[in-house]
């Protein structure tokens, strides 16, 4: 074998050893495609957070050599300048072992004035700096002297993103996530901020889902996007999948695997005040619990909820956010049901669409769809 062929073979073997391509995610099914359809409400056309009118999502996956597996996910409530056209918002903390930049001002004033960025733990401040620079360059921002950047994170620095200390994202990548944000389908699994994450000791990632509440009490849509990187004992539609597959992270004794975090972003076109958005956000934690999470001591479990309804936005010069309150308690209860269902399914999608990922620090396996099907069938859940 010649030197050139030998070198080519070594390169190919190395590529296989560290196969990090997210392309295989498109070949893995979403939860609903194998019959896992939590709840009673119908999904939107895309079954994604982008079913909520106006919401855009942009993602950049950062994979470098054998030690960087991370990325950025950007969620924009609308396509305009959020600083000049703010939306009502609220944040709920399930367990506060995390870094959610900008959270105190959001809960104090009840509004978002920037897009939401998700990334890895040590990249939060670089992401915020880049987003602020990007926003200051927008038209009408020449006299702005304060911006409350909202950036969430999970810690992917154990096996996959072992170069996390280098804070391996750039301002250009943050700008790319923001400027490439679009409506339509949202890529899931080992992409964007979910590139290096793990959940229930399998490969985690980005997941999304939506629900439409009935026209008799709406019609409104609730969409959820999650970045999963947490522990627990996985349950799917009540079936003890984690126990059946001997993935009992809560009993593993490994803090790195038992702890972790999840970021949950909730969007709705219902014209809710920040007070009612906080009530909506708190129900997302119920969807999280349905999947087997216990919000462990070292977990950062956060929910950011916002409304895209145009008539509840606040312009920068307006004295306060005016909100058309939903006085119908049946409407609110339907929204609560919807967000629980969408959160649960978004978490399943993050697992099902994730692909096995390797780095110099190790390998995190994707959950076996075939084994999940077999377990669900055994527990009376008819998978496709």
Task: Label each residue range with its predicted role.
Residues 1-8, 17:
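Bacterial N-terminal signal peptides that target proteins for export
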Residues 24-384:
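Alpha/propeptide regions of enzymes that mature by internal proteolysis
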Residues 15-17, 22-27:
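Boundary at the C-terminal end of the N-terminal hydrophobic targeting segment
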């Amino acid at each position: 074998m010649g030197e050139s062929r030998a070198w080519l073979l070594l390169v190919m073997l190395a590529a296989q050893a560290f196969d990090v391509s997210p392309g295989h995610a498109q070949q893995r099914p979403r939860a609903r495609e194998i019959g896992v359809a939590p709840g009673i409400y119908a999904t939107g056309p895309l079954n994604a957070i982008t079913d909520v009118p106006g919401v855009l999502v942009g993602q950049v996956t950062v994979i470098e050599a054998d030690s960087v597996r991370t990325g950025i996910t950007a969620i924009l409530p609308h396509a305009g300048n959020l600083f000049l056209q703010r939306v009502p918002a609220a944040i709920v903390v399930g367990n506060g072992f995390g870094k959610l930049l900008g959270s105190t001002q959001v809960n104090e004033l009840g509004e978002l004035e920037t897009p939401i960025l998700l990334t890895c733990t040590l990249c939060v401040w670089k992401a915020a700096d880049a987003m602020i620079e990007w926003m200051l360059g927008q038209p009408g921002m020449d006299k702005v002297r304060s911006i409350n950047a909202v950036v969430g994170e999970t810690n992917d620095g154990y096996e996959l993103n072992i170069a996390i200390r280098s804070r391996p994202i750039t301002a250009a990548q943050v700008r790319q996530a923001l400027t490439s944000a679009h409506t339509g389908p949202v890529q899931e699994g080992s992409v964007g901020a979910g590139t290096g994450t793990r959940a229930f000791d399998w490969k985690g990632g980005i997941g999304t889902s939506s629900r439409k509440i009935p026209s008799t009490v709406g019609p409104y849509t609730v969409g959820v996007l999650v970045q999963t990187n947490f522990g627990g004992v996985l349950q799917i539609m009540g079936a003890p999948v984690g126990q059946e597959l001997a993935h009992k992270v809560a009993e593993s004794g490994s803090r790195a695997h038992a702890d972790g975090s999840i970021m949950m972003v909730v969007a709705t076109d219902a014209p809710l005040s920040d007070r009612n958005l906080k009530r909506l956000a708190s129900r997302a934690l119920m969807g999280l619990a349905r999947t087997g999470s216990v919000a462990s001591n070292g977990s950062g479990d956060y929910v950011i909820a916002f409304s895209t309804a145009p008539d509840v936005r606040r312009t920068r010069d307006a004295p306060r956010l005016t909100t058309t309150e939903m006085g119908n308690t049946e409407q609110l209860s339907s929204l609560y049901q919807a967000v629980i269902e969408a959160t649960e399914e978004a978490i399943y999608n993050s697992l099902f669409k994730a692909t096995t990922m390797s780095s110099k620090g190790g390998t995190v396996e994707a959950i076996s769809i075939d084994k999940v099907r077999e377990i669900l069938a055994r527990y009376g859940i008819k998978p496709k």
